[in-house]
Structure formats: C-alpha cells, structure tokens
Amino acid sequence: MENIERESMEYDVVIVGAGPAGLSTAIKLKQQAIEASREMSICVVEKGSEVGAHILSGNVFDPKALDELIPDWKDLGAPLNTPVKKDSVRYLLNEKSNFSIPTLFATTFKNHGNYIMSLGNFCRWMAEYAEGLEIDIFPGFTASELIVNDGVVVGIATGDMGIDSNGEKKPSYEPGINLMAKYTILSEGCRGHLGKQAISLFSLNEDSDPQHYGIGFKEVWDLDPSVHEEGLVVHTMGWPAAKGVLSGSYLYHGENNQAFLGYIVPLDYDNPHISPFDEFQQWKHQASIQKYLEGGTRTAYGARALIKGGHQSIPKMHFPGGMLVGDDAGTMNFPRIKGTHTAMKSGMIAAESLFEEFYKENPMTDLNTVTSNFKSSWLETELHKARNFLPFIHKYGTLLGVALAGIDQLIFRGKLPFTLHHDQPDH
C-alpha cells in the first residue's frame, strides 16, 4: 500500500459487500449480540451508490434461509409479493420449434413455495432491517485491499477518490480510509477482488477442485399486460447454444407486468467464434419467448459472472482474521440456478461461528469452527446432493452427461456413493 496518511475507523466486524450473504451475516451477528445483551459494532461496506445498485437480477427465491433469519418477514413487508404459480421447462429446437419437458424429469426446476422477486429490492429491504439493528452501512465505498499484520487480516482499506483515468491524483483527490476490525468478512460475490486476494494469500483452495464459471446476461422488461402471466417461471435449454455447450436461459414473470430474463453460458466452451451476447439476442427471437416480449419495453440490462463449481470447488472458508461467505466462497447451487438462499445461509453460519468465539478471553483469529458448522447444516446437504451434476456433463458430454445427471437427481436424489471431480479450471 502507498504510504499515505489515512483516517482509520475501528469496528468489531467489517463486512465487504451488501448483498444477501453480507447482510445476512451482519443481521445474524447483531441478533445474537442483542439476545445475549452484548455490544458488537458492525460495518458493511458497499461499492454501489446505494444498496442494490449493482444487483440486476430477477430471482426465483427459496425463502428457507429467510424463514430462519427473519421469521416475521411477511409482517415486516419483505418485497416477496409474487409466489410461483407455474413452472415451464422447454427444450428449444430452433427459432420456431420447442417441446416441453415435464418437471417430473426436471426436478431441480420445481419452484412450488418459492417467490419471484427483484434481488436489488430485497437487498434494500434487508439493509433497512439491518440499519434498524444499528448496523452501519456505507454505500459508495470500494474495498481496495486487505490490511494484513503478522499474517492476520486486521481490516480493509477503501479506495481513493479523485483519481483520473491515468491513475493520477486530481485536485479533488481524497485518500481512502482504513476500516480496522477484529474480524473481516468477505461477501463480494463471484470473483470478488478481496476474496481472490485472501484465497491466494492463504492458499485457501489448495484442497479443493478448480472453480468453474459462467457469464450471465440479464434484462428487465415491462411486458404488454395482455401477455403477462404473473407467477410463471420459464426455463429453457437448447437452441441457439453451440453444439456441446450447455447454455441455459430463463424468463420470470414478476409483479406489475414486469419480467426478468437471462441467458447463461459456461466459460468452458472451446470455440473462439462463439458470441454469448449474440446467442442471447437470438434466444429472445425464439417463438416461445418472443411472444412475451413483443409490445414490451426493456428497462434495464447488464451482465455478471456466476460461480458454478459447486461443492467440490468450495475453498476453505476461514483464514486468520476473517471468512469467505456467499459467492466469494462459491455456495451457489447451479443445478437449481439458485444462490441467494445458499449465500444467506453461509453468512448465517459464519455469524454463528464468529459469535461462538468473539467474547472469549482469548478468541481464535482463525475461525475454523465454520467448517464443522457448515458440514452440519442443510446448506452442506443441499450442495452435496448437487455435487455430481456438472462433473457428469464435463466428463461425458452434454447429452449423456445431462442424462446421467438427471438420473442422479431424479432417481438417486444426489446420493450416489461416489463424487466426481473437476479436473481443470474452465477459464
């Protein structure tokens, strides 16, 4: 770090990222402190101008973790207003033709009891709840680097402001601040900047499989009310994906005639001429999708990396002075295309592990109890059941691999007596 005099602030816990994992960590910590009549200062740093500003996602949300974290969420007005009414899974043959796949054979796409929501709105609601618990949330601050002292993370430095495109200081330059903490929780999402630093610095992934990633394109549309079907969840596969590439796509009908759509391409394709963005544009012209978009208006769009290595690729979640949670750790359940409830639960597990140790006379800096707490949770059970889905496809190809993965999920419920592994990274 450049030798610049910086202001410092001290907290018991600093959390980087105000997504579902980071906010769940903060809320669970504060709930435990209040219940035990203890003081605990918590700060959440968020790079967006406001919480949710960098989260463009329609989301089919499993409320399992939320039921545990905030049991009275309905009474408190959580923005979960659209229960899933119907699932549709379709295989696209070409621009005109497709056929339906019964959800009996697509068990990972059954969404009864789930909700269609805006993840950005949900995170804003969680942030308001957290602030009501006197948790400090600082939007508009990037976390530029870890502060490490004698091999222990003791906080983070926020990014400097007033830097031009050449890296030179402008007249408006202001140095970042040091946020010092007894524990630092990294919840930045997929390929988080500080998460990568911690994984490299402490060799957290030396005993795990290589990680795997995808690129997801997302859009939000206002649909013509005559074609909007509130509560409908559509998942598709097939056309226009290139041969041998297991791309997937979705269209979720939310409230107020709004729809969320997206197209996901894994990064292990070997044809350099594939254009994931162009495939997304083609997909929107497939007859079963276009019928909903005609007469509608696109209101937002973006793209995001997503993490999909699964159970075998999760690194060690703890390091001296902190922990990884959510997609910094890789807790997404890719076969279900769901990561919000798993991210929340990982944050809650981290909070419980930290709280168990925090008030001891000589607390551990390396909270290794998070590993055993994770292994005894429903999160471990869920991710373990899904562990062979992607390796089957990587090992046996798209058609046979999907068939074997389907047998694993449908017949054996993810309980085959062996674990396949990712042999190499896909990036």
Residue spans for each PLM region:
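N-terminal Rossmann-like FAD-binding beta1-loop-alpha1 element of flavoenzymes
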Residues: 13-43
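Ferredoxin-type iron-sulfur electron-transfer modules and their immediate structural context
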Residues: 78-84, 89-93, 377-427
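N-terminal FAD cofactor-binding segment of flavoenzymes
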Residues: 39, 47-96
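Active-site-proximal substrate-binding core of FAD-dependent oxidoreductases
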Residues: 330-336, 352-397
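Conserved Rossmann-like nucleotide-cofactor binding loop
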Residues: 21, 50, 191
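Predominantly flavin-linked oxidoreductase catalytic cores and closely associated redox partners
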Residues: 129-289, 349
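Glycine-rich phosphate/pyrophosphate-binding beta-alpha loops
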Residues: 116, 328-341
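FAD-binding beta-loop-beta segment adjacent to the flavin cofactor pocket
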Residues: 303-334
